[in-house]
Amino acid sequence: SEKKIESILQDEKISYKALPENISEAPYISAKAKKYNLSELPNPESVNYKLTTETSIQAILSKPVSFGKNITALKLNEFLEQYVYEGSQFKLWEINEEQRTATFFQIVNNHLLYYNINGYVKVHWNSKNEVFMYEHAMIEKIEPLKQKKIIAPLQIIDELYSKNLLKTGANIVDMKLGYSSLLQMPQAQLFTPTWEVRV
């Protein structure tokens, strides 16, 4: 029961913010990896595109874009809007200062598509904070399928705890519903609703 789970978590000093409510189901989704046609991509005069596979590209900017002193989420989002094909379909996931990269995941059905080689943008910059290249892959022909029952957030936390994936004193800062890959078929991919838990 919820009360029992809550008291176990309290004993273990595992804290969490307000949990998402009213999410009882979400659809499975099928989609296809986009096959690129280089002629449809934006800014051909300032970006040199290269197909790394038929479903992913590398885009090298002829003139690197300076981000000034700091690489910020705001500047990265503006860069995506301005330079990246379908940039508004991607959301920032992480900035890695050490590797000088920022990774964006594709938004599908208003939720993030987690760690999928067919749904991401990776932006690269040099030691002067100038963006010189990005990688791009995306899914298209997105079709919602049958609904899947969603496990309640509190039960997910309990499951993580019982599998020793949550340590005593852990603080859950965020929980969101997204999508992860369930099945890869020759003609399409199948995605399932998945909880993202940030600790």
Model features per residue range: what roles?
Residues 1-94, 101-103, 108-112:
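Preferential activation on post-signal-peptide N-terminal prodomains/segments
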Residues 138-192:
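Intrinsically disordered, low-complexity segments enriched in Gly and acidic/Ser/Thr residues
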Residues 117-149:
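Short, structured interface segments that constitute the first stable element of a domain
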Residues 82-127, 176-199:
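Exposed beta-strand-loop-beta-strand "reactive/processing" segments of non-cytosolic proteins
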